[in-house]
Amino acid sequence: MKKFLRVFLIFIGVFFLASCGSKIETKTFVGSPQYGIDSTLTYTYQGDKVLTQTAKNIVSYDKLGITKEEAKTALEPVSKQYEDIKGLDYKLTYEDKQAIEKLTINYEKLDYDKAKKVDGIQIDGDSSKGISMKKSQELVESQGYTEQK
């Protein structure tokens, strides 16, 4: 009975410690609108390791001084570079007054070598250790983003 109780308490202790360290959290950063583009970045992370990052950009045709057709001509080649890269999910939709671009990066599945070649994706340091939430936050805040709480 003592042995069973001891094993049970050890199991509960290990389970408790594992559950404490595995909390998945989210942080969202909003960029100040520049050049007719509203940008929001959302990070999902565990500890200091970023699991996913989602960038949502809303591009106003009027603010850029272009038409919907001109936006398509300019953005279609950009959207092609995201195709066939494991870990990237890219969607671009055109509405009447704006285009909405959404890019989700799953760092657990990402083909880092291919992703590094894409314009706008910046991966510094040793990616085999994962992407640091702390460093990501410092980077986006240095670029004018503010955390949305």
Give residue ranges: language-model regions:
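Subset-of-secretome marker
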Residues: S22-K149
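Positively charged n-region of N-terminal signal peptides that target proteins for export
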Residues: M1-R6
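C-terminal motif of bacterial Sec signal peptides marking the signal peptidase cleavage site
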Residues: F16-S19
